[in-house]
Amino acid sequence: SSRKRHTRFTSDRSSDVCSSDLICGSVECIHSYSLIHDDLPCMDNDRLRRGKPATHIKFGESTAILSGNSLLTLAFEMIAEKNYNVKPNKKILILKKLAECVGHVGIAGGQFLDLSYEKKKVSGSKIISMQKKKTGKLFEFCCLAPAIISGADTKTKKDMSFVGEEIGFLFQI
């Protein structure tokens, strides 16, 4: 998928191949968690994902919730892994950014807005804000994490964040 290629492209720019693998793996975990939870009856209630039964249909709701939660925590475990060559202060920045991207200012916040906007007339700017949270923040993380690892300057990190968020928004269109 284009998301996987983008994740690998940006992560390959870091100085450590092992760290890029862990970053890519954590993003895949986050993405899978978000899809599993998005399909649940209390969310979008989708029965199919990519033409196959959604996780809650195939394995039950409780297993789907626990699987999604486990993938979410696994993403953080992967980045916190001590056996790769990234300085602790950079790991902390990456973990903080990942938490932001999946929490109330990111995926979870975007999903909340999505659910609250159902069957309502909502302005275009609110829809854009929701989409930037739901996908833009994770793409932002994909672009920013390698910049953090490589020790990029503040302007470069800000630019990478902006580019990632915009790519994520375009992904929604």
Label each residue range with its predicted role.
Residues S15-I173:
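Mg2+-dependent prenyl diphosphate-binding active-site environment of isoprenoid biosynthetic enzymes
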